[in-house]
A protein has these predicted regions:
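Short, small/acidic-rich helices and loops at N termini and domain boundaries
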Residues: 1-61, 224, 315-327
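Glycine-biased, small-residue-rich flexible motifs in mid-sequence functional cores and linkers
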Residues: 56-327
């Protein structure tokens, strides 16, 4: 109420603001700038120069789900493959501290989801980044920034790739910096424009849970990757599952909820010894190098080479402390 009262007072006394700015000098300059053609001509030239397409409220390509939001942006700025706005969007998000095994799995799921959806995510390190890479490999990646294009890190090779191969979006004016509150608003928009959300990793208090909160409030399907109870970086995911989110281990767990046929699992060519190693790790969930070496009777120096090969093939992922799990 204090904020609203301040805003009301500001509007009521707006005419008096001119006197505060050197008898209206600054006010007049602002009014002149916005009233003249030069400002808008400069903006149009910048949009064309930077290959940014404005998508206006209610216009073609504007997310229909945003039209129901009281605080919907008046304009969506886009760079890249605009046709992806016509696809069904599925959001895959995760905290910066998403563990390696979940990131590996999340990237694979994101890639396979592109068989039916365009995958939507943010641009943060960790879960968002791995989802973005997987979606790019699948050919349908959409990234929604928290700030304006003027503040997007131009040296970020991943975002450059999104511009060229996917679609980069911003709901903010070009030179809007990222503030603390920017992420929650972005996450709300992300949840609204997607048909569902998968959370790859989230502690008890994580930005990824904000996206999940809005998705649940909007009656979107919610999915989460399960974690061992001892992994604090996944406590938020486990809580989502307890609260009704779908436990997710493969892309098929998601696709089937939308009535789509599952993606056929690719057979990874393995040697007999590699198959035994994968089987051993699978039975235990994860295993230390010494345990695998003892079970297969293979010296650790030889095993290290084999495990590296299995990582390259996408069969296993290395965890901390010389431990491995299957993908």
């Amino acid at each position: 109420m204090k904020t609203a009262g301040g805003a009301v007072a500001l509007v009521r006394n707006f005419s008096g603001l001119a006197r505060e700015f050197k008898d209206g000098e600054l006010f007049s300059r602002m009014l002149e700038t916005l009233s003249g053609e030069a400002y808008f001509a400069g903006l149009a030239n910048r949009l064309e120069r930077e290959k940014i397409t404005p998508v206006f409220y209610g216009g073609e390509g504007y997310p229909k789900a945003w039209l129901t939001l009281a605080d919907a942006p008046l304009c969506l700025y886009a760079k890249g493959e605009l046709s992806l706005l016509k696809d069904e969007l599925f959001a895959v998000v995760g905290s910066r501290r998403t563990v390696d095994s979940a990131r590996k799995l999340g990237g694979k799921i994101a890639e396979e989801l592109t068989a039916r959806f365009a995958v939507l995510t943010g641009s943060a390190d960790g879960g968002d980044e791995t989802a973005l890479r997987g979606a790019l490999d699948g050919g349908k990646a959409v990234c929604l920034l928290a700030g304006g294009f003027g503040f997007a890190p131009k040296e970020n090779p991943l975002l450059v790739r999104v511009e060229k191969e996917g679609l980069l979006l911003s709901a903010c004016p070009l030179d809007t910096p990222v503030r603390v509150f920017s992420y929650e608003y972005r996450n709300k928009l992300l949840a609204a424009m997607s048909v569902g959300v998968l959370v790859l990793g989230a502690a008890e208090k994580s930005g990824a849970l904000i996206t999940a909160k809005y998705a649940a409030a909007m009656c979107k399907k919610l999915f989460a990757i399960p974690y061992a109870p001892s992994v604090l970086a996944g406590a938020g995911c486990n809580q989502l599952i307890k609260n009704g989110a779908y436990l997710t281990e493969t892309a098929n767990d998601i696709l089937e909820k939308y009535g789509y046929e599952g993606v056929e699992k690719k057979k990874i060519p393995l040697t007999e010894t590699e198959e035994k190693a994968v089987e051993f790790i699978t039975e235990r969930g994860e295993a230390h190098v010494s345990e695998i070496s003892s079970a297969l009777n293979i010296p650790t120096y030889r095993l290290a080479t084999m495990l590296s090969a299995l990582e390259v093939k996408g069969a296993v992922v290395k965890l901390g402390g010389n431990r491995y799990s299957v993908v």
